[in-house]
UniProtKB/Swiss-Prot annotation:
Protein name: Hexokinase type 2
Region feature (Glucose-binding): 167-193
Span of domain Hexokinase: 36-477
Annotated spans, Hexokinase small subdomain: 93-225
Gene: Hex-t2
Amino acid sequence: MRKSTRLLTHSLFGPVFKILFHNKTVCGGCNRKMPSLVNTEIEAAVKGFLIDQEKMTEVVERMTKEIKMGLAKDTHARAVIKCFVSHVQDLPTGKERGKYLALDLGGSNFRVLLVNLISNSDVETMSKGYNFPQTLMSGSGKALFDFLAECLSEFCHSHGLENESLALGFTFSFPLQQQGLSKGILVAWTKGFSCEGVVGKNVVSLLQEAIDRRGDLKINTVAILNDTVGTLMSCAFYHPNCRIGLIVGTGSNACYVEKTVNAECFEGYQTSPKPSMIINCEWGAFGDNGVLEFVRTSYDKAVDKVTPNPGKQTFEKCISGMYMGELVRLVITDMIAKGFMFHGIISEKIQERWSFKTAYISDVESDAPGEYRNCNKVLSELGILGCQEPDKEALRYICEAVSSRSAKLCACGLVTIINKMNINEVAIGIDGSVYRFHPKYHDMLQYHMKKLLKPGVKFELVVSEDGSGRGAALVAATAVQAKSKL
């Protein structure tokens, strides 16, 4: 028997406004009408995902402390948000010109690009994506970089570039300790990678050595960067006030423009003639020291246990696309096991780890209130048939709980950075599949940022076009131009 149900009086996305003459409930921040009835046990199960304003403020305070520790030389070693120096001090001016290569290794995506900067309004890009063999993700580092060089060679030969001397920007979307613009030490693998012989090594050297071993290309890797830095750079090419880059996709991270004098881990932080430095926060590790336990659930801990890096990347596991779908799946299977969904009948597919794709969350939440076309398709793919409306509403409610927490925590992170920069107006370049494809993520993020920021602070959320590709080329371009001025 289904337990008694009751009308929800709170919203996953913000405060509730009741329009009495329609007798409907509307979510603040997204104008999404709430489901009228949800099983109380299901509501209780997802309660831990519902972060209120007080908890969000606490997240901002704790993250502020961690970022300050990451920036300071004396506390950097024990900080969980490392705030690595990117060594990128020059933002695009819009006057960069020429052809540049970019190589983008970002977990689920691997691409080679040729970017031709013709003018600030005319940028030509040619790119090719390559399938990444699963075996390479846990094989040897040499095999990994030989594969990257092979794909780079194939791309260059197919575009008649094999005889051109080209600078390359390498977007490497894993935790890096940069010791120079073209020297980045891998701190740890994430996103399911575990290649041997790479952690603690300069990945630029590993790539350049693989290119040189082939002997068929005239390519010089001049810069390595994180995808967040590329996102910021690409956005700044068109939006001069862009000072923050954010990725919310397979993983999550942010970077921002800090005053050089505050970047104490930069050797020349007190003497550099350049006033600014892009800081790669690596905020995915926020909470690895336990400071986020008050916003984690038993489902988060269950997901963490089956990842290749248990106890690590705590913040990322709460908000990124790699884990959101699995969180939803665990809630569903728990509710089925307790008899609160689908009459206690479970399919083989839903029992498989990672079978509930994060894309399903976007699909389910794309349905209009009272409609279940996408929901039915998702359930069919999971082998769950003949569902009644309360089960479909419950699924949507669970998806909303997980996605709204992700947006709230991202909002906390961005507000922390804006407060740290102490600026009143900023553009934020954003990329990643969660932000791009979730139907309400932008609105949720914007809504909760406004609630947390002090009055008068203006911000703009901008989709950064091909940050990991064009952004890498722009870093290479600024590096080449800066070197030519020496």
